[in-house]
């Protein structure tokens, strides 16, 4: 269980090369080792030298040191191993003749610090210069200027020059001396390999890669402490705690950890707290096993109980947060009260203090699912809970307990008692047997790996192989919980044998299947390119959303969008439903952009929404491919969004119709539904002011959603070519009077239907007032007629206009304005 460590955020696992070398004899360079790890299935996201930003710094001896009058500066003669000493001006108060310090030579690179001499502000190059008239040919350095902290090197935290050992060789590079030449590997560990979430776990793999033996960390100790008579451990929830080990340590002396331990913890992102606490954090990184130390004086009843929490039972954890628990949470209790939230964090009431004299060390295996769910439900995460959630093996639990006791003895901070209790130890830490055939293993790989190589590889991975003809028997260590069947054996063989041995071949299907995109992919690409040409960016969101997203839209309970599929095991409640609309995520995206200072923009997403045919599910849902478009900004409006929707239609060589509509989340007078061939396929409109306010939007926003699956029949449609007429076009302006309920779209449609010679209809004026009467309005249109085979006559065009007016009157009650 994690203490309040001063740890920085680490996205993967940091592995110092120097720590690895304690367990494996590594005789290759760091970069070569990185390549070997990568070729064996480990993603090394980054590798770097600890002192990568430091160069040109050597050991210097100050031979003379004289103060510069009326300043805090000193002028020094510094021997750096050259023919003549260098003259360097220095303002540190701990500089003196006879002292050895790091010297940055001319052209060297070190870290630049702020006025507090602690905060790093980038790097700087050292140049020759003058201070108060004195030439200065270099710089004497502090620990901070070399990127060091007190945990990385003793004395580096002092606000002055870093004092080097008296036996440091003058003129030598300081990197090896200060261990700045160490390397760090930042390794991403996949979910199926929790055994590699530790330095020793990686060391086992490196040993196999280099075909070297791996050295086990020292586990021996002597039981010399006072016994704790009558101490018991009981596990009332064996399904949640397969193994629990408690060991009593007396004569504890809380103090600082040795420099080597503080340095190693610092290299993996953990700050030193005290020797006992550091031991638990050290083992977490070294062996991958979370541990906890209780102050024995606060454990009442001389007992430890592992049980489910009582409903509404409370505990205050080490970070001083109080939690109300339920029976889904596992707790560690003494005879009276909870003293830890199992696998997540210790209790404040039993923490290690400066006055602690006796400690109970805990090493346990907790059910990963329970720890993961408890951590998520309580909103409480720690290094330990994250580790338990990935899985901890029985072997590490036993090994870590012994390692902690060895370190207690090695650091001289306590005496190990013979009081040692293991509970619920029914699960074996011995290897389990697995059988396979060499033929099957090679069949999975598609190549013939020599039997001798298979045996060598499996032996190096500690599988203890026995081969009898074609039969292969291995012993799977307790820490390899990922090994289930012969394909797993094949994977282990090929990653060590080398993927480069596999000859690339085409799939058999590739011989008869032509490459390239299908019609659907080509059409979608055209739509994307067309929208990008209009200044829109593509967005991608999860296929899941939150129940609160449906509330954001203000949808009624019987709305189809509310009939969403709930996931059995969601990542979290915000991603618990399969989305039935793309609008909420687009709204959130618009809000995020505005909050981040992007006050105008256009975004689209092409993705699936999932419409269940019935709930609970009895058959697969209908996956509707959909495009959602969102725009926002001062220059955007309903019509610019309509233009983008029309762009989609134009790309497909079709026309959309727009009819006034109402939606709970869109402006009541700036909303339309989109029709194709009379069927509704989407909508567009402005978000309501309530939603814009709730999402903290500063600019108006508009969204559209179109069902692309409904348009699949027109994918790949080839447009027909109509030759440009060689005859002159004719136009007529029509001022029409109609009821206010008649829409522009209805009028345009009726005009176009009346004559095949109508090429276009454009609205140019709208009037409401006394001249047309109440409940009436006037709209004026320019109608363009295009001849096909001969010139128009005035009489012919007048005839078309009469047909138009008749059709308008019959269908919409529209009349020509007098």
Predicted regions and their residues:
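Phosphate-backbone binding interfaces of nucleic-acid-interacting proteins
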Residues: 6-223, 227, 360, 383, ...
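Glycine/proline-enriched, intrinsically flexible loops and inter-domain linkers
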Residues: 17, 35, 67-69, 210, ...
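A carboxyl-terminal module marker
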Residues: 35, 460-466, 482, 613-617, ...
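Beta-rich nucleic-acid/ligand-interaction surfaces
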Residues: 51-55, 221-224, 511-512, 516, ...
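Conserved mixed alpha/beta core segments that line enzyme active sites in large multi-domain catalysts
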Residues: 59-88, 267, 274, 280-349
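Mobile "lid/hinge" segments at catalytic clefts and subdomain interfaces of large enzymes
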Residues: 132-141, 145-147, 156-160, 175, ...
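Terminal amphipathic helices with adjacent charged low-complexity linkers/tails
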Residues: 210-235, 412-441
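Extended, well-folded interaction surfaces typified by the phenylalanyl-tRNA synthetase beta subunit core
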Residues: 434-599, 732, 784-786, 796-818
């Amino acid at each position: 269980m994690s203490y309040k460590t001063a740890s920085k955020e680490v996205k993967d696992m940091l592995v110092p090369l120097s720590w690895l070398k304690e367990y494996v004899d590594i005789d290759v360079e760091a970069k070569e080792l990185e390549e070997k790890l990568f070729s064996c299935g480990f993603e090394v996201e980054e590798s770097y030298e600890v002192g990568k930003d430091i160069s040109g710094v050597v050991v210097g001896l100050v031979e003379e040191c004289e103060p510069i009058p009326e300043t805090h500066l000193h002028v020094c003669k510094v021997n750096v191993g050259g023919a003549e000493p260098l003259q360097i001006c220095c303002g540190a108060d701990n500089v003196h003749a006879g002292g050895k310090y790091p010297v940055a030579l001319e052209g060297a690179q070190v870290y630049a610090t702020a006025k507090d001499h602690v905060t790093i502000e980038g790097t700087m190059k050292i140049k020759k210069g003058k201070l108060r008239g004195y030439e200065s040919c270099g710089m004497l350095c502090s620990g901070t200027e070399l990127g060091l902290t007190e945990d990385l090197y003793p004395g580096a935290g002092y606000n002055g020059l870093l004092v080097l050992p008296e036996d440091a060789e003058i003129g030598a590079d300081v990197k090896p001396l200060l261990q700045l030449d160490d390397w760090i590997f930042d390794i991403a560990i996949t979910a199926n390999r929790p055994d590699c979430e530790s330095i020793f776990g990686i060391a086992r793999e490196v040993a196999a890669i280099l075909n070297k033996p791996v050295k086990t960390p020292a586990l021996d100790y002597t039981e010399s402490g006072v016994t704790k008579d009558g101490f018991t451990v009981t596990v009332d929830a064996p399904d949640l705690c397969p193994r629990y080990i408690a060991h009593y340590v007396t004569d504890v002396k809380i103090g600082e950890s040795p420099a080597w331990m503080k340095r190693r913890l610092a290299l993996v992102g953990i700050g030193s707290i005290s020797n006992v606490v550091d031991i638990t954090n050290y083992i977490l990184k070294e062996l991958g096993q979370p541990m906890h130390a209780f102050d024995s004086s606060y454990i009442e009843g001389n007992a430890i109980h592992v049980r489910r929490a009582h409903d509404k039972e409370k505990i205050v954890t080490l970070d001083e947060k109080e939690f109300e628990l339920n029976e889904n949470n596992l707790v560690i209790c003494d005879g009276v009260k909870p003293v830890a939230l199992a696998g997540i964090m210790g209790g404040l009431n039993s923490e290690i203090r400066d006055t602690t004299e006796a400690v109970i060390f805990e090493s346990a295996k907790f059910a990963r699912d329970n720890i993961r769910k408890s951590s998520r439900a309580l909103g409480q995460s720690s290094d330990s809970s994250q580790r338990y959630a990935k899985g901890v093996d029985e072997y590490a639990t036993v090994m870590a307990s012994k390692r902690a006791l060895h370190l207690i003895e090695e650091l001289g901070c306590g005496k190990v008692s013979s009081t040692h209790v293991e509970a619920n130890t029914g699960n074996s830490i011995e290897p389990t047997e697995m059988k396979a055939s060499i033929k099957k293993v090679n069949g999975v790989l598609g190549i013939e790996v020599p039997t001798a190589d298979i045996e060598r590889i499996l032996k190096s991975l500690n599988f203890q192989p026995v081969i009898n003809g074609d039969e292969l028997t291995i012993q799977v260590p307790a820490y390899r919980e990922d090994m289930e069947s012969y394909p797993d054996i094949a994977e282990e063989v090929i990653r060590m044998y080398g993927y480069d041995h596999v000859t690339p071949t085409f799939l058999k299907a590739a011989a008869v299947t032509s490459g390239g995109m299908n019609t659907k992919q080509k059409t979608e690409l055209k739509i994307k390119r067309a929208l990008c040409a209009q200044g829109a960016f593509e967005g991608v969101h999860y296929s899941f959303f939150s129940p609160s997203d449906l509330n954001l839209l203000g949808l009624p309970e019987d709305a189809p969008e509310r009939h969403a599929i709930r996931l059995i095991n969601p990542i979290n409640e915000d991603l618990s439903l399969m989305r039935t609309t793309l609008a909420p995520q687009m709204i959130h995206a618009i809000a995020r952009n505005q909050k981040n200072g992007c006050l105008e923009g256009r975004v689209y997403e092409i993705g699936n929404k999932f419409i269940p045919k019935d709930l609970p599910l009895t058959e697969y849902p209908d996956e509707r491919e959909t495009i959602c478009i969102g725009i926002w900004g001062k220059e955007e409006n309903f019509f610019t969004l309509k233009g983008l929707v029309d762009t989609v239609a134009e790309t497909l060589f079709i026309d959309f119709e727009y009819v006034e509509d109402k939606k709970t989340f869109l402006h009541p007078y700036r909303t339309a539904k989109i029709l194709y061939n009379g069927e509704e396929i989407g909508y567009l409109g402005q978000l309501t002011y309530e939603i814009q306010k709730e999402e903290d939007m500063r600019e108006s926003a508009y969204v559209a959603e179109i069902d692309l699956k409904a348009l699949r029949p027109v994918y790949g449609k080839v447009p027909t070519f109509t030759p440009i007429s060689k005859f002159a076009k004719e136009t007529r302006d029509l001022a029409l009077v109609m009821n206010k309920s008649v829409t522009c779209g209805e009028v345009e449609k009726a005009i176009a239907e009346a004559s095949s010679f109508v090429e276009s209809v454009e609205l140019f004026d709208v009037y409401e007032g006394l001249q047309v009467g109440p409940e009436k309005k006037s709209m004026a249109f320019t109608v363009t007629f295009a001849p096909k085979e001969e010139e128009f006559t005035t009489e012919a065009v007048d005839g078309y206009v009469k047909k138009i007016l008749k059709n308008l009157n019959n269908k919409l009650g529209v009349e020509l304005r007098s």
